[in-house]
Protein backbone atom coordinates (compact mmCIF):
# COMPACT_ATOMS: atom_id res chain seq x y z
CA UNK A 1 0.00 0.00 0.00
CA UNK A 2 1.47 3.33 -0.99
CA UNK A 3 1.75 6.24 1.38
CA UNK A 4 -1.12 7.92 -0.51
CA UNK A 5 -3.37 4.90 0.07
CA UNK A 6 -2.40 4.80 3.74
CA UNK A 7 -3.27 8.50 4.03
CA UNK A 8 -6.64 7.81 2.36
CA UNK A 9 -7.28 4.96 4.79
CA UNK A 10 -6.44 7.16 7.78
CA UNK A 11 -8.84 9.84 6.51
CA UNK A 12 -11.60 7.25 6.07
CA UNK A 13 -11.01 5.98 9.61
CA UNK A 14 -10.99 9.56 10.91
CA UNK A 15 -14.37 10.39 9.33
CA UNK A 16 -16.27 7.33 10.58
CA UNK A 17 -17.31 8.69 14.01
CA UNK A 18 -18.86 11.81 12.45
CA UNK A 19 -20.63 9.72 9.80
CA UNK A 20 -22.13 7.49 12.49
CA UNK A 21 -23.14 10.44 14.65
CA UNK A 22 -24.87 12.12 11.70
CA UNK A 23 -26.66 8.91 10.72
CA UNK A 24 -27.86 8.21 14.26
CA UNK A 25 -28.64 11.76 15.34
CA UNK A 26 -32.10 11.96 16.86
CA UNK A 27 -32.64 8.20 16.92
CA UNK A 28 -34.92 7.41 19.85
CA UNK A 29 -34.36 4.72 22.48
CA UNK A 30 -36.72 2.22 20.87
CA UNK A 31 -35.35 2.67 17.36
CA UNK A 32 -31.78 2.26 18.63
CA UNK A 33 -32.71 -1.17 19.98
CA UNK A 34 -34.91 -2.45 17.16
CA UNK A 35 -33.45 -5.42 15.36
CA UNK A 36 -34.48 -5.63 11.71
CA UNK A 37 -34.71 -9.42 12.12
CA UNK A 38 -34.31 -11.68 15.16
CA UNK A 39 -30.83 -12.84 14.15
CA UNK A 40 -29.51 -9.37 13.26
CA UNK A 41 -28.05 -6.58 15.35
CA UNK A 42 -29.83 -3.40 16.30
CA UNK A 43 -28.17 -0.01 15.70
CA UNK A 44 -26.86 0.16 19.28
CA UNK A 45 -25.41 -3.35 18.99
CA UNK A 46 -23.60 -2.39 15.78
CA UNK A 47 -22.07 0.68 17.46
CA UNK A 48 -21.00 -1.34 20.52
CA UNK A 49 -19.41 -3.87 18.18
CA UNK A 50 -17.47 -1.14 16.37
CA UNK A 51 -16.39 0.37 19.70
CA UNK A 52 -15.03 -2.92 21.03
CA UNK A 53 -13.46 -4.01 17.73
CA UNK A 54 -11.57 -0.73 17.74
CA UNK A 55 -9.30 -1.75 20.58
CA UNK A 56 -9.73 -5.51 20.88
CA UNK A 57 -9.44 -6.43 17.21
CA UNK A 58 -7.95 -3.95 14.76
CA UNK A 59 -6.04 -1.75 17.20
CA UNK A 60 -4.77 -4.76 19.13
CA UNK A 61 -3.67 -6.57 16.00
CA UNK A 62 -1.83 -3.55 14.61
CA UNK A 63 -0.04 -3.28 17.98
CA UNK A 64 0.98 -6.96 17.71
CA UNK A 65 2.65 -6.17 14.39
CA UNK A 66 4.27 -2.94 15.59
CA UNK A 67 5.59 -4.56 18.77
CA UNK A 68 6.67 -7.78 17.05
CA UNK A 69 4.55 -9.95 19.35
CA UNK A 70 4.17 -13.64 18.63
CA UNK A 71 0.47 -14.00 17.86
CA UNK A 72 -2.94 -12.44 17.61
CA UNK A 73 -5.31 -12.95 20.52
CA UNK A 74 -8.49 -14.85 19.62
CA UNK A 75 -11.65 -12.75 19.70
CA UNK A 76 -15.36 -13.59 19.81
CA UNK A 77 -17.48 -10.54 18.91
CA UNK A 78 -20.75 -12.52 18.88
CA UNK A 79 -20.12 -13.57 22.49
CA UNK A 80 -19.20 -10.00 23.45
CA UNK A 81 -22.60 -8.79 22.24
CA UNK A 82 -24.36 -11.05 24.73
CA UNK A 83 -21.91 -10.93 27.64
CA UNK A 84 -21.44 -7.16 27.47
CA UNK A 85 -25.13 -6.40 27.04
CA UNK A 86 -24.86 -4.47 23.81
CA UNK A 87 -28.64 -4.38 23.38
CA UNK A 88 -29.07 -2.57 26.72
CA UNK A 89 -26.22 -0.09 26.18
CA UNK A 90 -26.66 3.66 25.88
CA UNK A 91 -26.32 4.69 22.23
CA UNK A 92 -24.79 8.10 23.06
CA UNK A 93 -22.27 6.46 25.41
CA UNK A 94 -21.41 3.78 22.84
CA UNK A 95 -20.87 6.45 20.17
CA UNK A 96 -18.70 8.50 22.55
CA UNK A 97 -16.70 5.39 23.42
CA UNK A 98 -16.20 4.60 19.75
CA UNK A 99 -15.09 8.17 19.02
CA UNK A 100 -12.57 8.14 21.90
CA UNK A 101 -11.16 4.75 20.93
CA UNK A 102 -10.93 5.76 17.28
CA UNK A 103 -8.93 8.85 18.27
CA UNK A 104 -6.51 6.59 20.16
CA UNK A 105 -6.27 4.33 17.11
CA UNK A 106 -5.54 7.26 14.83
CA UNK A 107 -2.75 8.40 17.16
CA UNK A 108 -1.32 4.86 17.03
CA UNK A 109 -1.41 4.83 13.23
CA UNK A 110 0.09 8.32 12.99
CA UNK A 111 3.04 7.26 15.13
CA UNK A 112 3.57 3.92 13.37
CA UNK A 113 6.57 3.75 11.05
CA UNK A 114 5.30 2.73 7.61
CA UNK A 115 8.05 0.10 7.27
CA UNK A 116 6.67 -1.67 10.35
CA UNK A 117 3.13 -1.49 8.97
CA UNK A 118 4.40 -3.11 5.79
CA UNK A 119 5.99 -6.00 7.71
CA UNK A 120 4.12 -9.28 7.82
CA UNK A 121 2.31 -9.90 11.06
CA UNK A 122 2.26 -12.47 13.77
CA UNK A 123 4.31 -15.62 13.42
CA UNK A 124 1.08 -17.56 13.77
CA UNK A 125 -1.17 -16.78 10.82
CA UNK A 126 -4.68 -15.49 11.30
CA UNK A 127 -6.69 -18.55 10.31
CA UNK A 128 -7.12 -19.16 6.61
CA UNK A 129 -5.73 -15.70 5.78
CA UNK A 130 -2.13 -16.48 6.66
CA UNK A 131 0.25 -13.77 7.87
CA UNK A 132 -1.05 -10.21 7.59
CA UNK A 133 0.82 -6.93 7.42
CA UNK A 134 -0.25 -3.86 9.31
CA UNK A 135 -1.31 -2.36 6.00
CA UNK A 136 -3.52 -5.39 5.32
CA UNK A 137 -5.15 -4.75 8.68
CA UNK A 138 -5.61 -1.04 7.94
CA UNK A 139 -7.31 -1.90 4.64
CA UNK A 140 -9.53 -4.44 6.45
CA UNK A 141 -10.29 -1.84 9.15
CA UNK A 142 -11.68 0.59 6.57
CA UNK A 143 -13.62 -2.22 4.88
CA UNK A 144 -14.98 -3.31 8.28
CA UNK A 145 -16.21 0.23 8.96
CA UNK A 146 -17.95 0.34 5.60
CA UNK A 147 -19.47 -3.11 5.96
CA UNK A 148 -21.03 -2.07 9.26
CA UNK A 149 -22.05 1.32 7.87
CA UNK A 150 -23.98 -0.52 5.15
CA UNK A 151 -25.41 -2.89 7.77
CA UNK A 152 -26.49 0.06 9.90
CA UNK A 153 -28.05 1.92 6.97
CA UNK A 154 -29.93 -1.22 5.96
CA UNK A 155 -31.17 -1.80 9.52
CA UNK A 156 -32.36 1.80 9.81
CA UNK A 157 -34.14 1.64 6.44
CA UNK A 158 -35.87 -1.64 7.25
CA UNK A 159 -36.80 -0.51 10.74
CA UNK A 160 -38.17 2.75 9.36
CA UNK A 161 -40.31 0.93 6.79
CA UNK A 162 -41.67 -1.43 9.48
CA UNK A 163 -42.30 1.35 11.97
CA UNK A 164 -44.35 3.38 9.54
CA UNK A 165 -46.44 0.50 8.17
CA UNK A 166 -49.09 0.48 6.76
CA UNK A 167 -47.59 3.48 4.94
CA UNK A 168 -45.83 2.27 1.83
CA UNK A 169 -42.17 3.08 1.31
CA UNK A 170 -41.47 0.97 -1.77
CA UNK A 171 -41.57 4.07 -4.00
CA UNK A 172 -38.08 4.82 -2.59
CA UNK A 173 -36.76 1.63 -4.13
CA UNK A 174 -35.76 -1.69 -2.64
CA UNK A 175 -34.70 -1.55 0.97
CA UNK A 176 -31.20 -2.98 1.47
CA UNK A 177 -30.87 -6.44 2.93
CA UNK A 178 -33.84 -8.79 2.71
CA UNK A 179 -36.04 -9.26 5.75
CA UNK A 180 -35.23 -12.97 5.81
CA UNK A 181 -31.58 -13.84 6.16
Feature map (PLM): residue ranges:
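Acidic/histidine-rich alpha-helical segments that form the ligand environment
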Residues: 16, 21-23, 79-120, 136-151
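A short small-residue
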Residues: 1, 78-86, 125-128
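Amphipathic, non-membrane alpha-helical segments in soluble helical-bundle scaffolds
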Residues: 3-13, 40, 91-95, 135-138
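Short helix-to-loop capping/linker segments positioned immediately adjacent to catalytic or ligand/cofactor-binding
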Residues: 30-35, 92-95
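Short, contiguous alpha-helical
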Residues: 33-77, 120-181
Amino acid sequence: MSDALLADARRALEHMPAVLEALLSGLDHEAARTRPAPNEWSPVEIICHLRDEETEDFGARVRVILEGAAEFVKIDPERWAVERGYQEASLPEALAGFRARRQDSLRLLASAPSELLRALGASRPLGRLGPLSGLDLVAAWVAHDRIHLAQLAGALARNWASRWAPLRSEYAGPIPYPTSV
